[in-house]
Amino acid sequence: MTQYARPDSDVSDGSWVNQAGSNTNLYQSIDEADGENDSDYVISTDSSSSSDTMEVGLSDISDPQSSSSHIVRYRAKGSDPSGFYGIPSLTVSLRQGSTQIATATNSSLTTSFADYNFTLSSSEANAITDYSDLRLRFVLSIIHISEPTRPY
């Protein structure tokens, strides 16, 4: 039986807001069942630090009694409104409480929404002991350049 754990609570917001500019109930902007609703989303508003973290709790699912087919799926895009830093990388980690279970860094975000995923190894999936305490952490990492490069 296929199960889907979807965002159902905010754990920490960092400097992230939703499409309306609010940092309240961010999970509601990324909890779509179809995954293709790009009209609501979350975005980091922090351009002064090297990284910004948001974490959401996931809905409870039962232990599948198998370590196969544990897949984290998300939809994302990147932008560089300043024109100086390039498109940031996005690290997504699956956590059980404060313990990291699996993580993947995406350094190739596109400027249009696209689907991304990573599959847990058997050992990562077997490390999950409480399927009612799963979370997703999103860390946006910006590379700062002190001066833009200009040809002379």
Task: Enumerate the predicted regions with their spans.
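A short beta-strand element within beta-rich, extracytoplasmic domains
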Residues: 57-81, 136
